[in-house]
Amino acid sequence: MATPHINAEMGAFADVVLMPGDPLRAKYIAETFLEDVVQVCDVRNMFGYTGTYKGRKISVMGHGMGIPSCSIYATELIKDFGVKKIIRVGSCGAVNEDIKVRDVVIGMGACTDSKVNRIRFKGHDFAAIADYKMVRAAEDAAKARGIDVKVGNLFSAELFYTPDPEMFDVMDKYGIVGVEMEAAGIYGVAAEYGAKALTICTVSDHIKTGEQTTSDERQTTFNDMMLIALDSVLLGDAE
């Protein structure tokens, strides 16, 4: 049965969903990496697809920008469509000189300046963390392909155009591996509804140096991240 934001039928989604922010990246992932692909939803042009990867049923759907948007889609997928695992595959900015543009980072946790998890957790701080086995599977998948990844804390920002750029120095000091806008929200939703989640990001720009990729590159060239996510699903099944 369709929800207010996802016009799919029950059973349309696999138990694992890859979620990029950009719905056109969802389309790219489905058309590039999956077989027997069927588009299952398109409300607000937030496209969702289901297909198979090496015989394994997997879905992919966009989640938009920011914690409020991704939380809506993650909640409905888990609560209404029975999704068990969400893997966000997105872009992030780097603040550390040892992390370069196009590096892949795995978010084992996510700090945030958003209050959504405090609202969810009765005013207390909630440690927004990824599922350990999903983190391990992603790291193992990367090693199997010879892809170097950085594993650490992300920072999920409430604002893209921040009025406090000095915060980037604080993030660097605390070892933040990437700045994005969704992981903490997705981890909170997963915890609330008893699901599992992971965020894998490709560094699209470096906040300190100004180096950046184009919007077209962000949409269609971050293939290492996609392959790590897909392979990690198969490794998770094998446990």
UniProtKB/Swiss-Prot annotation:
One of its GO terms (molecular function) is purine-nucleoside phosphorylase activity. Phosphate binds at G21, R25, R44, R88, V89, G90, S91. Disulfide bonds: none annotated. It comes from the Bacteria. Its EC number is 2.4.2.1. One of its GO terms (cellular component) is cytosol. It catalyses: a purine D-ribonucleoside + phosphate = a purine nucleobase + alpha-D-ribose 1-phosphate; a purine 2'-deoxy-D-ribonucleoside + phosphate = a purine nucleobase + 2-deoxy-alpha-D-ribose 1-phosphate. It comes from Vibrio parahaemolyticus serotype O3:K6 (strain RIMD 2210633). This is Purine nucleoside phosphorylase DeoD-type 1. The active site is at D205. One of its GO terms (biological process) is purine nucleoside catabolic process. The keyword Glycosyltransferase applies. Catalyzes the reversible phosphorolytic breakdown of the N-glycosidic bond in the beta-(deoxy)ribonucleoside molecules, with the formation of the corresponding free purine bases and pentose-1-phosphate. A purine D-ribonucleoside binds at H5, E180, M181, E182, S204, D205. It is an enzyme of class 2 (transferase). Homohexamer; trimer of homodimers. CDD domains: PNP_EcPNPI-like. Transmembrane segments: none annotated. Belongs to the PNP/UDP phosphorylase family. Keywords: Glycosyltransferase, Transferase. InterPro entries: DeoD-type, Nucleoside_phosphorylase_CS, Nucleoside_phosphorylase_d, Nucleoside_phosphorylase_sf. Gene3D superfamilies: Nucleoside phosphorylase domain. The record marks R218 as: Important for catalytic activity.
